[in-house]
Amino acid sequence: MEISYLCAARQADVLELRWMQISDKGIFIQQGKTGKKQIKVWTPRLREALETAQAACPKLSPDALVLYNSDRGQFIRKTFNNRWLKAVRAAQSELNRQLDYTFHDIKAKAISDFEGSSRDKQIFSGHKTESQVLIYDRKVQISPTLDRPVIGKK
């Protein structure tokens, strides 16, 4: 989840991530949907997320998956989504409120939280067009208001 958020990566791109995609520069991700190739540059938080993943799923070989199931194979979507729902329920219990989020919402949250122009967000997210980014960017825009004196009021 953390890797997906920090890299604005889709679920499938994270579940298919292999150790040979990890380099000194960052994490190489070729998005399955758009084919966009990016190296997601290291930040301390991204390194920590990868270390957490490695603690749960030790590196088996360069071509091994970064995240794997109990059989050391790739998670199937249904199993992963069940784990996601379990995590959401735990968060609901801890926060004492309903949470209606899907894993796909993580990418939208990442794009919304990323500081910069819609063009910057396009580069970050790997979308082919700015209009695609605008669909994901859910950040409420701050806009100016009209500040004129009332007519006839002194």
Write out the residue ranges for each language-model feature:
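Conserved tyrosine-mediated DNA breakage-rejoining catalytic core shared by Y-recombinases
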Residues: 7-55
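A short, basic/aromatic helix-end/turn motif that makes direct DNA contacts
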Residues: 16-22, 114, 122-130, 136-139
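Hydrophobic alpha-helix feature that most strongly marks membrane-spanning transmembrane helices
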Residues: 55-58, 89-93, 115-116, 126, ...
